[in-house]
Amino acid sequence: TYPVSEKMRTTSDYTQEFVFTKDISEGYDHEVTLDLLPGNYNVMVWSDLVQTSGDSHFHNADNFAEIRLQGDHKGNNDYRDAFRGSNNISLVADIMEHLPDTLDIAMQRPLAKFEFVTNDVVEFIDKESVRVASKANGNKAASTDDTPTRAVNIEDYKVVFYYVGFMPDAYSMNTDKPVDSSTGVMFESTLRKLSESEATMGFDYVFVNGKKSAVTVQIGIYDNEGTQLSLTEPIEVPLKRSHHTIMTGMFLMSEASGGVTINPDFDGDHNLIFP
């Protein structure tokens, strides 16, 4: 809780701090009781997730003016999700017994989520089957029967996402905007089949302001020996707060380039298809 004046809030320490935990298997809504002296308050709430009690948080929220990602960057983890909210309340001294004052705070994500889905799994397996067979034969030409064996397991391949330029890594509750970013950010992932032809390559959460934003990434594919098989051109990923952007294309077999088509039929999602 902070003084209600915005000027005071940015120049003085908070009045009181409260920390609560809750099992979200029971739902995200949470009702708490606070013991506050009479006065005007701005109540600011930050909520993030841990998988099990005692785990380290992905965010360091000790300073609401600069909530930072901490530790090595970890993509592909829905426990990176987080929520923020604020509201004002006036508490008056009253010698008469009355019902406690109540305050509802609507929580919203200060984040956007993006995900890459590749739709050339069959072609990739065919190509890799031939390459692996050729390598097994001492780099000789494959057999005259060039039908792939389909012994390739796509989960054996590593996907690496490289952020090109800056990746926002700090957020201010006071301004409701990202306030800092880092360069050289990357994270690893694996391919997970969605169907015979499609696989998800990985996803991440990014701090964004209330307007549309974007990050740029490159995606590298590596075999189980660490050999780089491909690296896309830089891909700009459009982001919108509390929306899930899904990028679909032939990311395994070819460098991603060209325009995108936005499917507006999703509520809360962007579908972007690389032709």
Task: Identify the meaning behind each predicted range.
Residues 108-122:
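A short, Gly/Thr-enriched small/hydrophobic beta-strand-prone motif that recurs across taxa
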Residues 19-24, 51-102, 184-194, 225-254:
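Structured interaction patches on ligand/partner-binding surfaces of diverse proteins
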Residues 30-32, 101-105:
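Short strand-edge motifs at loop-to-beta-strand transitions and within beta-strands
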Residues 104-112, 204-211:
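Conserved "repeat-terminator" motif of extracellular CCP/Sushi domains
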Residues 1-57, 126-239, 272-275:
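Tryptophan-paired
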Residues 250-275:
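Intrinsically disordered, low-complexity repeat and linker tracts
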